[in-house]
Amino acid sequence: ETCQDVEDETDEMKIIPLFPSTLHAYTVKDFDKEGLLDYIYAEYDFDPEGRTISNRGGWQSSVDYTAEDNPLLDVVERTLRHDFFFRTLKHEDFHIEDLWININRPGAFNHKHNHPGSVFSGVFWINAPKDSGLLVFDNPNAFTMWDEMNSYSDEFQKILPVHPAYYMTPKEGMIVIFPSSIYHKVDLNESVENRISIS
């Protein structure tokens, strides 16, 4: 429990977000994009069927890449241990429970879903061409806050994002971590290239 007094030292309006959902974004520096892509396409050639969960029109690996050392686990774990586990969490015993590959071909997308049984989920974009599909997060309070959100001016909504959904453009080399309970989807890949990520 936290109690925080609002100091009234100025006449300016104060905005205090109550109970926000947090999204963490990290840039992976100097990652071997071509090496990772070679590894990913070799995995695809080994198991071209993959599995279907939320993906439509694309390929998702059926292998658990946390079971043994591999370049995918190495780059994600190295980044998260330094930037997320140690600097953000109070417990150091968090670990990556599952890791899979996503190849969203042109025209592919992912239905809205979340990840029960996990605390945090995330995505690392390895190849993210322009127009390859936004990552869309649904506001879990969109129904109960609908009238409140529609009452705010456009200017205020820009200051403090209070929208029914949050849209994020994928960026190569970025890892995004978010609460597993939040429903999210991937929009249609409207580019002519594969959008490739690991989650």
Language-model features and meaning:
Residues 89-99:
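A short coil-to-beta-strand element that immediately follows conserved catalytic motifs
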Residues 184, 189, 194-196:
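Extracellular and organelle-lumenal recognition/adhesion modules and their flexible linkers in secreted
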Residues 9-91, 109:
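Non-heme Fe(II)/2-oxoglutarate
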Residues 122-123, 193-199:
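A short hydrophobic beta-strand segment most commonly corresponding to one strand
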Residues 102-177, 187:
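Catalytic core of non-heme Fe(II) oxygenases with the double-stranded beta-helix
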